[in-house]
Amino acid sequence: NIVNEAKTDLDIMWGHHIAFGLPFLENGAQIECNAKKIISEQAMPDSRRFKPGVETDWPSAINLNDQKENASIIPAESEFPYSELSYLSGFGEKGNYSIIDSDRNLGFHLSWDANIFKYLWYWQERYSTQDAPWWGNTYAIALEPWTSRWTPDPKQAINNGEWLSIPKDGTISTKLSASAIIP
């Protein structure tokens, strides 16, 4: 539950930072997801995987060489470093994903209310960012349900109705369901 105890309406971004790393992703992994669309964030470093601002049908994405690439495949740790943030959307009523390491026959599954969490942030930091806060020493993939996409202009996003609005004295109830995938 999220409760607005204020005497005024409140507009928020709300998300859950669910991240994965080593050794789970050492050999790469596969994402299975019911998203329909993917678009990559404009405001990311140059050392990235996908072309920014181009919306495609999930799991296809356009890479920096203007080639189609399967975005559901997470490359092995030994492959090229990059930093990326993409947004998956178009889930219908319920969003869900599984991330699976087929070499270890192990995975993780998550489902959520896609009427509230309309986006899945697909964040990847693979030893690319050489300054704060990662210092070239972070390998993480996060699949994060969020109510909206990131914005440098919160006021504009609120005016456009992009953020979740909680009425004064209001409550929003939801749940996420997580499970391990073990044979």
Predicted regions, residues:
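Short Pro-Gly-centered flexible turn/kink motifs
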Residues: 46, 164-182
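Glycine-rich active-site loops that engage anionic ligands at enzyme catalytic sites
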Residues: 100-148
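Beta-strand-rich interaction surfaces with strong enrichment in secreted/lumenal proteins
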Residues: 131, 161-166
